[in-house]
């Protein structure tokens, strides 16, 4: 449910015990019920948080999921092009092209996108985490971050396999160059770290340059970003 135009009021779960079902996974999703002078309105929890400019990147990064994330980014830009967006990431990674589509949209829109790692950010998940607005990339203390080079399988004639191998190498170079941009590390350092699976704890990821802050609790004051639209730590 993506109903974002309800009346402003305090949301409550109450005693209704209402849930909706995720159409993809079948998982139960809590429903928030709002009371207003115009009556009662219900939102699934993710739609309610989207009204607060919070987006979730969870599970495998693939084309359908990427399309949903991109649509939310574009919608929030249309709502307010100068107000920050918070992106919470808990993902094992996935398809490179799907992740790059999300990344390009993050760069394309006008609002700044703060990224927050909860749980894990591996492979393309770590890429999106590092791609957040500089100074606004956050990991919670028990988050795990993993980086590695892209992988893929090739089948068919030898010439087709050769073409696909060249494409993977080209993607690897592009990814390495972007990680250099995100982290400030040298290309040699990035290539070495990306050669195999490299797992990092939150503090290690901060030292490496993948995130800027490790927060155990939400700061009471604005300590993350400055300027118009800044809300400090993510909402």
UniProtKB/Swiss-Prot annotation:
Molecular function via GO: ATP-dependent peptidase activity; ATPase binding; serine-type endopeptidase activity
Subcellular location: Cytoplasm
EC number: 3.4.21.92
Catalysed reactions, as listed in the record: Hydrolysis of proteins to small peptides in the presence of ATP and magnesium. alpha-casein is the usual test substrate. In the absence of ATP, only oligopeptides shorter than five residues are hydrolyzed (such as succinyl-Leu-Tyr-|-NHMec, and Leu-Tyr-Leu-|-Tyr-Trp, in which cleavage of the -Tyr-|-Leu- and -Tyr-|-Trp bonds also occurs)
Superkingdom of the source species: Bacteria
UniProt xrefs under InterPro entries: ClpP, ClpP/crotonase-like_dom_sf, ClpP/TepA, ClpP_His_AS, ClpP_Ser_AS
A GO BP entry: protein quality control for misfolded or incompletely synthesized proteins
Alphabetical keyword list: Cytoplasm, Hydrolase, Protease, Serine protease
Active site per UniProt: 123, 148
Tagged with keyword Cytoplasm: yes
Pfam name, any one: CLP_protease
Cellular component GO terms held in the UniProt record: cytoplasm; endopeptidase Clp complex
Function: Cleaves peptides in various proteins in a process that requires ATP hydrolysis. Has a chymotrypsin-like activity. Plays a major role in the degradation of misfolded proteins.
Family per similarity comment: Belongs to the peptidase S14 family.
Assembly behavior: Fourteen ClpP subunits assemble into 2 heptameric rings which stack back to back to give a disk-like structure with a central cavity, resembling the structure of eukaryotic proteasomes.
Name of this chain's protein: ATP-dependent Clp protease proteolytic subunit
Organism (species): Novosphingobium aromaticivorans (strain ATCC 700278 / DSM 12444 / CCUG 56034 / CIP 105152 / NBRC 16084 / F199)
């Amino acid at each position: 449910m993506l109903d974002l135009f309800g009346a402003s009021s305090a949301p409550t779960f109450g005693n209704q015990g209402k849930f909706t079902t995720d159409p993809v996974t079948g998982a139960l999703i809590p429903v928030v019920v709002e009371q207003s002078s115009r009556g009662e309105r219900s939102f699934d929890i993710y739609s309610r948080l989207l009204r607060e400019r919070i987006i979730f990147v969870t599970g495998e990064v693939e084309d359908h999921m990427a399309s949903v994330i991109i649509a939310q980014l574009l919608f929030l830009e249309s709502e307010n092009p100068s107000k920050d967006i918070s992106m919470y990431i808990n993902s094992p990674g996935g398809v490179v092209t799907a992740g790059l589509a999300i990344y390009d949209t993050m760069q394309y829109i006008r609002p700044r996108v703060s990224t927050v790692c909860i749980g894990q950010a591996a492979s393309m998940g770590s890429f999106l985490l590092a791609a957040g607005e500089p100074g606004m990339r956050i990991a919670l203390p028990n988050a795990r971050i993993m980086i590695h080079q892209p992988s893929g399988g090739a089948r068919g004639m030898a010439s087709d396999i050769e073409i696909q191998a060249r494409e993977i190498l080209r993607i690897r170079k592009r990814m390495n160059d972007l990680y250099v941009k995100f982290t400030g590390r040298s290309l040699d350092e990035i290539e070495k770290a990306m050669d195999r699976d490299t797992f990092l704890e939150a503090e290690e990821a901060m030292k490496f340059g993948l995130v800027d802050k490790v927060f155990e609790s939400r700061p009471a004051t604005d300590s993350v970003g400055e300027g118009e639209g800044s809300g400090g730590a993510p909402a």
